[in-house]
Design a protein with these regions (language model features):
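Short N-proximal segments of mature Sec-exported proteins
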Residues: 31-94
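C-terminal partner/receptor-binding element of secreted or periplasmic proteins
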Residues: 103-125
Length: 125
């Protein structure tokens, strides 16, 4: 094997050990919080990550609009300024993985539970 071949082989071995898992087609519901976590932790530049970001952003925006329209109790109150999308999704993944029962919840229930714990509303809201 040439030096170039050895270098490529060594790089692949090193990358494989710490590489994010590939999301599968079954995760693209996403039916559970675990499915959403798999999508959010896929290899960067993978369609799964884009799906995760779009799903989360869409769900949050719809819920925020519902909170304004129905004027009931709010599930969460976003801080000002809000966290970056990458920061929030990283925190969500860590939160979900910290307790296996969270992974079995529906994807939106898990996301909103995380947000309600991370960004609770003041008692008056």
């Amino acid at each position: 094997m040439t030096l170039k071949g050895c270098t490529v082989a060594a790089a692949l071995v090193l990358l494989a050990s710490g590489a994010p898992r590939a999301a599968t087609e079954a995760n693209f519901g996403p039916n559970t919080t675990g499915d959403l976590v798999e999508l959010c932790t896929a290899i960067p530049d993978n369609a799964a990550v884009n799906f995760c970001e779009g799903f989360a952003q869409g769900a949050v925006l719809v819920e925020m609009q519902n909170q304004v329209a129905f004027r009931g109790p709010k599930l969460f109150c976003m801080p000002n300024p809000p966290p970056s999308r990458n920061q929030a999704l990283s925190e969500f993944v860590n939160w979900a993985r910290s307790s296996p029962d969270r992974l079995a919840q529906s994807s939106t229930d898990g996301l909103f539970r995380f947000l309600s714990e991370r960004s609770p509303c003041p008692p008056s809201l």
